[in-house]
Amino acid sequence: MKRLVLVAGGTGGHIFPAIGLGQCLSSQMPDLEVSYVSGSRPLELEIYGNAGIEPVFLPCEGSPLGTGGVRAVTRWIQVLRSVRAMTRFFGETKPDACVLFGGYVSFPALVAGRIKQVRILVHEQNAVAGKVTRLAARLGIVPLTGWEACEPLSKGQFEEIGVPVRPMKRLPRREAWNKLGLGGLPDGKICLVLGGSLGSSALAGKVAEISRLPEFTGWSFLVMGKEMGDNHPSDGVWGIPRRWDMGPLYSLADVAVARGGASTLSELRAWAIPALVVPWPESREDHQAANARLFEKCGCGLVWDEKRGSEGEFVARLIQLGKKSDAENDSSVDPGIAADRTSQVFLGKILRTLEGGDGNWMD
């Protein structure tokens, strides 16, 4: 029995790739024991619980960096306790390898891994490296990345492998719609609006505005996020409660409007759904904009700047993507192929990391 630990917390952008990798590897390697490690935020508990996973929860709820006063002191204490808990966990389970998926929860695992001499891999989903990724690179760990760029690291300091995506099955259109419980299936184009795991009232508001324009006659907009609730605020616009089973929504989407989180963009790419990406302007070091530029560069969609772009540009680009979906008709694309491909590459990197030890996991 081989043991692999996947460390991911914070938001769905870190957690979903870990779940995607773990599920793919577990289905292919029955003798592989996969454990998950998370922080203690309610959102993290919700995401893992929905996937039927019981992770090891570290006693921390966020990074002490960027905070001050009592909150910063409290979080530093949580970090120290988490390092101790992670060190104890590594000592008890003796994993063959550990993969860090970034976010605040990865720092205690990185420190504990150095203490217990656990082989560590780091995956960076975004086109801008996070603090743990940069620290790992300075320690001689070559980050595995989701994109062809990982600022400020230069070529040769990282290796692009893609972002693991959750294995999901494409459903027939009517079956997918019925799972949402929204009544009769509408005719015309369906646009999926994704604000990330934290939701986005700004995107919901923008869609509500443009949905009334004559250019979008016959379109239906499915707006997912906690702000909308389960409602039908106007003709052609449905609010979908936050959900983690995305298969029905991806199966319905002809086009999407989305924030620039790497996990979301990778899943849209795997499903061949053209997307208008609206990067969240407050993202760390503007990493969502960097993700969006590379998403556009690979021909998967277009970018609209929320602060500087006009409504006319938003409308024109969304219409352009709607025409792209008509021309390419990618409804037969199997998203499971992309999930399997990235996981196989990842497995190869894990095995390479174990060279020199008992690294033959395939016996």
PLM regions: where:
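Acidic donor-binding loop of glycosyltransferase active sites
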Residues: P95-A97, S251-S266, I273-P274
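Active-site-proximal region of nucleotide-activated glycan assembly enzymes
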Residues: S35, E54, R114-R174, L182
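Conserved nucleotide-sugar phosphate-binding/catalytic loop shared by glycosyltransferases and other
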Residues: R3-G9, D31-R81, I161-V163, D305-K307
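Short hydrophobic beta-strand element within catalytic cores of glycosyltransferases
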Residues: A258, P274-E285
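C-terminal "capping" alpha-helix adjacent to the active site of nucleotide-linked donor transferases
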Residues: C298-G299, V303-D305, G309-D326
